[in-house]
Swiss-Prot record:
Protein name: Acetolactate synthase 3, chloroplastic
Family as reported in the entry's similarity comment: Belongs to the TPP enzyme family.
Region (Thiamine pyrophosphate binding): 469-549
Subcellular location: Plastid, Chloroplast
Species annotation: Brassica napus (Rape)
């Protein structure tokens, strides 16, 4: 039987399995049992959008690395489906997986023990595993691999898959499934994970023939890393894992509906039109997002040639150095005043690798209302989805920038671009509305803690975060110099992301300084991953900004709900004068050094100690809960609604 997939553009026609057919009800599967008669279900098309990473082993033809692969099996030697699956991962260059075993996936784990090249980093929860795989992928550009068992193991991956889908992160998730004969019978630990994840994966597969494993794995990696990166799920029934077979590694991929829609290189005429608009403008601004992360060199050259200031989305941080004089840092709801001012007053908005999401635009009709808009993105579905551009290019931002840079270099004398007056105007805004914070006695402003960390690491650390106030402060006050330094759940906003993401980043970058800047609410959601950090001896540093509250929700309570507290206090109401829970004891239980700091004057030394201590370390920084993330444009608001003053000490 052919492998079942979730998307109609991919061919379902294949030779029937040579293995003994099993009596499976046609009502129990999310696809038609007759290849010539596809299911009448509506299928979601495969998404293609802004590139985040260079494709890794994704060319349709075999690469030299795959050609020279040496198998530990003789070519005609039968082996289990699980061993075929693991070897398929090896052939894709996989060196690390984040896998938690269970009844329906233990065959895969047994096969992993027979691999001499793949390391399994054992998370303490499947959500920790998928977030760690994301951290690995986001920090390295390579696809992250996570493995879970059927039922609750698979459903525990859902938040991570949705997160990777929204942020365009290349993931391959492999799940065990109940044996084929039990599918649809409500068997123990059975969930229809293909159906569950249909709308939060770029594509997914239910493997129904052991012979299809080599092709499916190759396709999964190609889909995850080409076009718009994203998560792909491969669901493998246990009897498929146990079945003996001789793999055919030369099977071609069958992705006609996908391959035909991959964007072509941008046309010279389109790029020339954009250069003409630049030459005619007086107040241009760059608006760059996650789709520009793989184009930082080309973007830097473009800015050098044009002198156009750069504003970044949360996902785009690091694509252009935040400490450069032409950087406006982040725009949007909690972006800098000067970045939002630039967009508000621009006459040309160059939107590269972005999707005009609500946290950036606020009220769509008012966003960049005076500007001509140029939108370059590799996903045709994103162009015109929220904001209609005057000029659009559906293609790779990297190729578009390379092409425009050539045009600009060839026409430099003719164009003589000079936006000095505009840059001076924006410099005045920087002087007038800098990112700032207030100090109250000995209390530690959370912004100051991040500022000190930036100074002591010289802006070279890889930073992961949870979600909330600390996330926004980390985006504002740490100056990212390069892409892939900033790892954060941007589109989904998943709390609990920071700690496991730091694990993945540390595994992918063993020589890097990796710091999880976290809040007490987010941190405790995946606190069990401290055990993984200790067992794997990963030098992850945790800068915990602890205010005993759900800070961002509390900020909205202060501003819009008359400070009425609705379950945002995370401490013990019976012991409000004590820090609860004691995060140091969590660290101590896992054998991780930890310390607490409560006074501003002691903070710098405490952070330096954290950085100097070999291995992992947790620093519990006690912060006042009254702090607000500013600037702030209320949801659905415009630049005119920007809030720059106040905190929880004021009544509104």
């Amino acid at each position: 039987m052919a492998a079942a997939t979730s998307s109609s553009p991919i061919s379902l026609t294949a030779k029937p399995s040579s293995k003994s057919p099993l009596p499976i009800s046609r009502f129990s599967l999310p696809f038609s049992l007759t290849p010539q008669k596809p299911s009448s279900r509506l299928h979601r098309p495969l998404a293609i959008s802004a590139v985040l990473n260079s494709p890794v082993n994704v060319a349709p033809e075999k690469t030299d690395k795959i050609k020279t692969f040496i198998s530990r099996y003789a070519p005609d030697e039968p082996r289990k489906g699980a061993d075929i699956l693991v070897e398929a991962l090896e052939r894709q260059g996989v060196e690390t997986v984040f896998a938690y075993p269970g009844g329906a996936s233990m065959e895969i784990h047994q096969a992993l023990t027979r691999s001499s090249t793949i390391r399994n980093v054992l998370p303490r929860h499947e959500q920790g595993g998928v977030f760690a795989a994301e951290g690995y992928a986001r920090s390295s550009g390579k696809p992250g691999i996570c493995i879970a068992t059927s039922g609750p193991g698979a459903t525990n991956l859902v938040s991570g898959l949705a997160d990777a889908m929204l942020d365009s992160v290349p993931l391959v998730a492999i799940t065990g499934q109940v044996p084929r004969r039990m599918i649809g019978t409500d068997a123990f630990q059975e969930t229809p994970i293909v159906e569950v994840t249909r709308s939060i994966t770029k594509h997914n597969y239910l493997v129904m023939d052991v012979d299809d494993i080599p092709r499916i794995v190759q396709e999964a990696f190609f889909l995850a890393t080409s076009g718009r990166p994203g998560p792909v799920l491969v669901d493998v029934p246990k009897d498929i894992q146990q079945q003996l077979a001789i793999p055919n590694w030369d099977q071609p991929m069958r992705l006609p509906g996908y391959m035909s829609r991959l964007p072509q290189p941008p046309e010279v005429s389109q790029l020339g039109q954009i250069v003409r608009l630049i030459s005619e403008s007086k107040r241009p601004v760059l608006y760059v997002g996650g789709g520009s992360l793989n184009s930082s060199e080309e973007l830097g050259r473009f800015v050098e040639l044009t002198g156009i200031p750069v504003a970044s989305t949360l996902m785009g941080l690091g694509s252009y150095p935040c400490n450069d004089e032409l950087s406006l840092q982040m725009l949007g709801m909690h972006g800098t005043v000067y970045a939002n001012y630039a967009v508000e007053h621009s006459d040309l908005l160059l939107a590269f690798g972005v999707r005009f999401d609500d946290r950036v635009t606020g009220k769509l009709e008012a966003f960049a209302s005076r500007a001509k808009i140029v939108h370059i993105d590799i996903d045709s579905a994103e162009i015109g989805k929220n904001k209609t551009p005057h000029v659009s290019v559906c293609g790779d931002v990297k190729l578009a920038l390379q092409g425009m840079n050539k045009v600009l270099e060839n026409r430099a004398e003719e164009l003589k671009l000079d936006f000095g007056v505009w840059r001076s105007e924006l410099s005045e805004q920087k002087q007038k509305f800098p990112l700032s914070f207030k100090t109250f006695g000995e209390a530690i402003p959370p912004q100051y803690a991040i500022q000190v960390l930036d100074e002591l690491t010289q802006g070279k650390a890889i930073i992961s975060t949870g979600v909330g106030q600390h996330q926004m402060w980390a985006a504002q006050f740490y100056k990212y110099r390069k892409p892939r330094q900033w790892l954060s759940s941007s589109g989904l906003g998943a709390m609990g992301f920071g700690l496991p993401a730091a694990i993945g980043a540390s595994v992918a970058n063993p020589d890097a300084i990796v710091v999880d800047i976290d809040g007490d609410g987010s941190f405790i959601m995946n606190v069990q991953e401290l055990a993984t950090i200790r067992v794997e001896n990963l030098p992850v540093k945790i800068l915990l900004l602890n205010n005993q509250h759900l800070g961002m929700v509390m900020q909205w309570e202060d501003r819009f709900y008359k400070a009425n507290r609705a379950h945002t206090y995370l401490g013990d109401p019976a012991r409000e004068n004590e820090i609860f829970p004691n995060m140091l004891q969590f660290a101590g239980a896992c054998g991780i050094p930890a310390a607490r700091v409560t006074k501003k004057e002691e903070l710098r030394e405490a952070i330096q100690t954290m950085l100097d201590t070999p291995g992992p370390y947790l620093l519990d920084v006690i912060c006042p809960h009254q702090e607000h993330v500013l600037p702030m444009i209320p949801s659905g608001g415009t630049f005119k609604d920007v809030i720059t003053e106040g905190d929880g000490r004021t009544k509104y």
